[in-house]
Amino acid sequence: MLNIPENQHNSIEIFTPDQVLENRGRVAIFIDGSNLFYAALQLGIEIDYTKLLCRLTAGSRLLRSFFYTGVDRTNEKQQGFLLWMRRNGYRVISKDLVQLPDGSKKANLDVEIAVDMMALVGSYDTAVLVSGDGDLAYAADSVSYRGARVEVVSLRSMTSDSLINVADRYVDLDQIKEEIQKTSKHHVSYNNFPVSVLDQDRSSR
């Protein structure tokens, strides 16, 4: 049995949240647009995507920020929003919505998110996943095993425990809503889009 001197136990260093953020290195952000949209609805806020990007980066070096969403190419408001996103720091990954038998529309981008997270391992030190979808837990865990830090940002009530369990850090959107909500009307409004033109695949529990 390994005997560790008592004074060595007392010398274990405890890092503050600020010190943890300082060690994030290069950051890559992966945003599940549909999941974030529904979280914002639950919180009763409108997301300011400039503030969101700043908050998620938190002063670290940003490699790239991906935004994944289903699209209706006939919806001019949504196209305008996505154009704004592309011009303001986001790489937009989109997929055409498919109409389901019940009349709703859906575009599942879990595969795209997982593939991009894995493909870029080695280029970033910290992956920030904005989603509560448990289907992404395996990809997040795989990224972690390959040496990257994983942070999950989502609304707790919409987040799978399996995703939280594989994360190095979890941030509840409810705790940072004051920092990321829109306070002016200068930007294109995401909440103006009808739910039918957005990916309606809610997070799995």
Where are these predicted regions, by residue range?
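Terminal and domain-boundary accessory regions
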Residues: 1-205
